[in-house]
Amino acid sequence: MATESALIKVHVKSPSNKYDVEIAADASVSELKDKVLVFVPTANKEQVCIIYTGKILKDEETLTQHKIADGHTVHLVIRNQARPTPAPAAATPTASSAPSSNPTPSSQPNPTNNPFAAMGGMGSPADILNNPDAMRSVMDNPITQQLLGNPEFMRTIIQSNPQFQALIERNPEVGHILNDPNVMRQTMEMIRNPNMFQEMMRNHDQAIRNLQGIPGGEAALERLYNDVQEPLLNSATNSLSGNPFASLRGDQSSEPRVDRAGQENNEALPNPWASNANQATNNQSNNRSADFNSLLDSPGISSLMEQMMSNPSMQASMFSPEVINSIRQNMSNNPGLIDSIVGQIPSARDNPQISEGIRRSFPQMLNMMSDPSVMEAMRNPRVSEAFRQIQEGFSTLRREAPQLLNLFQAGAMGGGAFGSDANASSAGANSANGLADLFNSMNMGGGRPSSTAAPVNPEQTYASQLEQLQSMGFSDRARNVAALTATFGDLNAAVERLLNSP
Amino acid sequence: MEQSSLLLKKQLADMRRVPVDGFSAGLVDDNDIYKWEVLVIGPPDTLYEGGFFKAILDFPRDYPQKPPKMKFISEIWHPNIDKEGNVCISILHDPGDDKWGYERPEERWLPVHTVETILLSVISMLTDPNFESPANVDAAKMQRENYAEFKKKVAQCVRRSQEE
C-alpha cells in the first residue's frame, strides 16, 4: 500500500534563476508553488505563476494531469504586485491537502476525518445514497470530483476498508481491478453520470445475453461468476451491503440500505450453477462432481479451453492430479455421465459412430492427463500458445466457412476440447485425424512470421528510413538502426520510440 | 505519416524535456500536432516584463518547406504585431524574394527554423521592435511620438495578460 508516491525532481526556471524542486509525482500545482516559495521568499503565493507547455497551471490542477515527470522543467514567473491582490482562496489548499493528510480515514472513525464531511448541508449520508439526485450532486461537487479524480486516494480508501482488504486478500485479481486507475475513473464517471450509468447497465446486460447466446458463453459466465461475482457479493453482503463508503461514515448504524448497483449486477449475471445444478440428475453426493457435471454439460468446453489458455494458473489447477483423479472417479462411478456429455453435442447425438468414438476416447484421455509428462507438456506456455492458435483457427473457420465446420464439429468437441491429447493418442474417431491435419496446417500458417522476417542487415534494409531519421535530427545512427529494427522499418513508430526513450 | 508531423513531434518532445527560456510551448489539442499553443513570457527589462502572452502557431502540412503562422491571442501592443495579433517578422515570410525588396532571401523563412528559433526571434522582436515595416502603424507611430502613452498601453496589455 503506497501512501507516499514517488518523488520527482522538477526544474523550475525563472527568467533569472533556476531551482530544483523535489515533489510527489501526483502533487497539485498549489503544492508545487509552496515549494517554489521557499526559493522566492519575497513573493507571495498569488504572485507565483507556473507555466508548462504553453499553459499557465492552475492551483487545483495536478502535475500528473499535465504530464510533468521527473526531470522536466517548468517556467516560473513572479507577477508584479501592481494591482491589489484578490482575497486568498482558502478553500482549495485545504481540499487538496486532504488526501495526503488522511491516509487511513477509516481506521479512525472520526467525523472530521470523513472527506465527505467537507460537503456540509448535503443531508445525511444515508439520504444521499438513497437518492440518486443527491448522489449526483455530491458527485458533481468539485471537492468530491477532486478527491475521486485522485486514484491514489481512492485506493487508500478502499484498502483501508477491512471488508475490501479481506476480499482482495482472497482474490488478488479483484485487487488488480481496484488498483487500475482507469477502472476507478470509469466507475466514478459512471456514478456521476446517470445516463452513462444506465447505458453501462444496458450494455452489460446485452453483452451477457450475447455471451449466453454464443457456444461456450455459459462456461465463460460460470468462471466470471465464480472468480469475481460470488466473492464480491459474499463479502459485500456480509456487512458492507455493497457500499464501499459505509465504513467511512462515522455512524456504523445497521439500518438496511438500498444499493442499486449491487442489485442490478445480481440480476445481470445469472448464476449458471443454479440452473445447471437442477439439471444434473445424479452425483449430488459430492460437491466437486456436481461441479464437473454441470461443467461438462455445458456445450462450451472449447471456450473454457480458451479461458484456460489465457489464464495459466487456472490451467494449472484444472490439470492438477486431484482434479483429474476426481474426474476419473466420477466417470467410473457414473457411466451415464459420458452419455450425458455426448448427448450435449448435437452432431454426436445424430451420429452414433462419433459418439461411440468419443465415449471410447474419454477414459484414455483422462489416463493421459494423469501422466505427469503430459501434464508437464500441458503447462508449457508454448503448448498453451498452440492451443490458443487452434482455438483461433477454429473460430475463424466458424466465421468463414460454417459448412466446413459441420463436417468437423464432432471431432472438434472430442478433439478440439482436448486437442493435443486426441491427436497424440489417436484416441478420437477417424474424423479427428482429418481435424488434426487441419489444425496442423493452421498452426503452420499462423506460426511466427516475425522470426523469418528479421532482416539480415538492418542498415541496408532501412537505408532510406535511416537517412530520413538523420535529416530529422536523430544523429545517433546506432540508436536509429535499433529503433528501425525494433519497429520493422516503420519510420513513424521508430520516431515515437526514439522520442520516448531518454 | 508526413515528415512535418514527425519533425514537430521531435521538437515537442525536445521542448518538454528542455524548455527554452522565455517561452513555453505545447499543443492546443494533443491530437493535432500542427497547432501549437505558446506562452511568451514578457522578456525582462522590457516594457513587456511580467506579462504572459498567449499565441497560436499554425503549421502548414508542408512544414518545414513553408513557415507557420503565428498569432497572439492575448492583446499585445507592438509595432510588429498587427491589431489581430498576427506576428509580422521576416523569418515567418514565405521563402523567396520579397516583392518590395525590403528583406533579403536569407532573412526570410528557411527550413532550418524550428519553434525555438521562431520564438527566439519573436522575443527579440519584443525587445527591439523593427520600425522599418510596422504591422501596427498606430503602435509604431505612438512609440515614436508619444512614448509615455505607448508605455501605458503596453502596461495595460501586460496587466490584462496576467489576469487571464
From Swiss-Prot, chain A:
Expressed in the pharynx, hypodermis, intestine and head neurons. Upon ER stress, expressed predominantly in pharyngeal muscle, hypodermis and intestine. GO terms for molecular function: damaged DNA binding; polyubiquitin modification-dependent protein binding. GO terms for cellular component: cytosol. GO terms for biological process: ERAD pathway; negative regulation of double-strand break repair via homologous recombination; nucleotide-excision repair; proteasome-mediated ubiquitin-dependent protein catabolic process; protein export from nucleus; ubiquitin-dependent protein catabolic process. It holds the Pfam family ubiquitin. Residues 8-83 form the Ubiquitin-like domain. InterPro entries: STI1_HS-bd, UBA, UBA-like_sf, Ubiquilin, Ubiquitin-like_dom, Ubiquitin-like_domsf, XPC-bd_sf. Disruption phenotype: RNAi-mediated knockdown causes a reduction in lifespan. Induces ER stress characterized by the expression of hsp-4, the accumulation of ubiquitinated proteins and an increase in ubxn-4 expression. Mutants display increased homologous recombination repair in response to DNA damage compared to wild-type worms. Worms lacking both POST (F36D4.5) and ubql-1 have a shorter lifespan and display an accumulation of ubiquitinated proteins in the nucleus. Induction: Induced upon ER stress. Residues 252-262 have a biased composition (Basic and acidic residues). The keyword rRNA processing does not apply. Residues 84-115, 274-290 have a biased composition (Low complexity). Residues 455-501 form the UBA domain. Residues 235-251 have a biased composition (Polar residues). Residues 124-157, 161-200, 289-327, 351-387 form the STI1 domain. Keywords: DNA damage, DNA repair, Repeat. Gene3D superfamilies: 1.10.260.100, DNA helicase RuvA subunit, C-terminal domain, Phosphatidylinositol 3-kinase Catalytic Subunit, Chain A, domain 1. Coiled coil: none annotated. CDD domains: UBA_PLICs, Ubl_Dsk2p_like. Residues 84-136, 235-294 are annotated as: Disordered. May play a role in the ER-associated protein degradation pathway (ERAD) possibly via its interaction with ER-localized proteins ubxn-4 and cdc-48.1 and/or cdc48.2, providing a link between the polyubiquitinated ERAD substrates and the proteasome. Also plays an important role in the regulation of other protein degradation mechanisms and pathways including ubiquitin-proteasome system (UPS) and autophagy. This is Ubiquilin. The lineage of its organism: Eukaryota, Metazoa, Ecdysozoa, Nematoda, Chromadorea. The gene is ubql-1.
Curated annotation (Swiss-Prot), chain B:
PROSITE patterns: UBC_1, UBC_2. GO terms for molecular function: ATP binding; ubiquitin conjugating enzyme activity. Keywords: ATP-binding, Nucleotide-binding, Transferase, Ubl conjugation pathway. It catalyses: S-ubiquitinyl-[E1 ubiquitin-activating enzyme]-L-cysteine + [E2 ubiquitin-conjugating enzyme]-L-cysteine = [E1 ubiquitin-activating enzyme]-L-cysteine + S-ubiquitinyl-[E2 ubiquitin-conjugating enzyme]-L-cysteine. Pathway: Protein modification; protein ubiquitination. Residues 3-163 form the UBC core domain. Its EC number is 2.3.2.23. SMART domains: UBCc. GO terms for biological process: proteasome-mediated ubiquitin-dependent protein catabolic process; protein polyubiquitination. The active site is at 88 (glycyl thioester intermediate). Belongs to the ubiquitin-conjugating enzyme family. Catalyzes the covalent attachment of ubiquitin to other proteins. This is Probable ubiquitin-conjugating enzyme E2 7. It comes from Caenorhabditis elegans.
